[in-house]
Amino acid sequence: MASGKATGKTDAPAPIIKLGGPKPPKVGSSGNASWFQSIKAKKLNSPQPKFEGSGVPDNENIKTSQQHGYWRRQARFKPGKGGRKPVPDAWYFYYTGTGPAADLNWGDTQDGIVWVAAKGADVKSRSNQGTRDPDKFDQYPLRFSDGGPDSNFRWDFIPLHRGRSGRSTAASSAASSRAPSRDGSRGRRSGSEDDLIARAAKIIQDQQKKGSRITKAKADEMAHRRYCKRTVPPGYKVDQVFGPRTKGKEGNFGDDKMNEEGIKDGRVTAMLNLVPSSHACLFGSRVTPKLQPDGLHLRFEFTTVVPRDDPQFDNYVTICDQCVDGIGTRPKDNEPRPKSRPSSRPATRGNSPAPRQQRPKKEKKPKKQDDEVDKALTSDEERNNAQLEFDDEPKVINWGDSALGENHL
């Protein structure tokens, strides 16, 4: 039955987000959740967030005049012995006139509410952007072009591409809690320990833990498909699947460490973000067919460009330096220490070890107290204990607008 209404603004819901992921959600959902992921306090009783810049998440489909809203505190708890225990708060963004505080005007004072506005925003106006229905739409990644929240807050990594069947896996990494901005702060990078490689390794480890396990039969099938469709299963070396590494010809990527560790090497996951998809390879490559005695040979020439201002540019350059024609080498920080070898010369008075002198016995020290024992924990034990603090020392991935923007792990 045809509708009697003419086509109007109210009948054509406008998209809310344009982030290169799944199709943007529409206005008018029945849910009351924020469109965006939350920022999370690093510690209990943290002060309300302060922002470098406007504090309004990037949304290309919202006019400048509508770029205003509020961050709302959400208390969080985890189950524990004797009842639930509080954990650091989460803060969610809503546009003015939407969400749990829809009845407030911009700037109205209320506990747990922080108002933000972009330059040029009309804070007297109210938004018609609605809220998110969690049953229909995933939350969207936070991006701040003019700077993010202060160092007391962080947010989890959410890939820009994901389907409803697989909600994002929050991955951790010891990086700054601010996303790289497109201007002065864009060039800031964390130390070498917290760079792209460590983050990528953590992502794939978390996904393997939470995902379905790969059986031995499945792994064998993955490693022995048609050559162009093979993938390296967990526990396999690269040369078990794709043959020995070479120099100057096909199969020249990977050093000895990468070959031995396979996909456990975080550099593999990092570089896969630059590898073209099947469609990109087919339609974006220079394809050269050539008939040979053994069959048809297809050559695909594809170029991926990583801009020099990309936040991960230096990391990609380092990985390429290590792994292109890298057979027979290892990263400098991963070179095995040479084992000491016993001398093959016959013992003489000149090279025989002198008799050891008897050392005076040392007095036994009293046992360390509990607080002293804690100080003697190994680095691995300290790291494990830190993880038990439940987000007390969170790690964050902020990819920003990098070469990874249109890919997901």
Swiss-Prot record:
Residues 215-331 form the CoV N CTD domain. It is found in: Virion; Host endoplasmic reticulum-Golgi intermediate compartment; Host Golgi apparatus. GO terms for molecular function: RNA binding. Residues 70-84, 358-367 have a biased composition (Basic residues). The modification Phosphoserine is found at residues 190, 192, 379. Residues 15-31, 166-179 have a biased composition (Low complexity). Residues 31-156 form the CoV N NTD domain. Residues 1-84, 122-145, 164-194, 238-258, 327-409 are annotated as: Disordered. ADP-ribosylated. The ADP-ribosylation is retained in the virion during infection. Keywords: ADP-ribosylation, Disulfide bond, Host Golgi apparatus, Phosphoprotein, Ribonucleoprotein, RNA-binding, Transcription, Transcription regulation, Viral nucleoprotein, Virion. Disulfide bonds join 320-323. CDD domains: CoV_N-CTD, CoV_N-NTD. Coiled coil: none annotated. The modification Phosphothreonine is found at residue 378. Belongs to the gammacoronavirus nucleocapsid protein family. Packages the positive strand viral genome RNA into a helical ribonucleocapsid (RNP) and plays a fundamental role during virion assembly through its interactions with the viral genome and membrane protein M. Plays an important role in enhancing the efficiency of subgenomic viral RNA transcription as well as viral replication. This is Nucleoprotein. It comes from Turkey coronavirus (strain NC95). The gene is N.
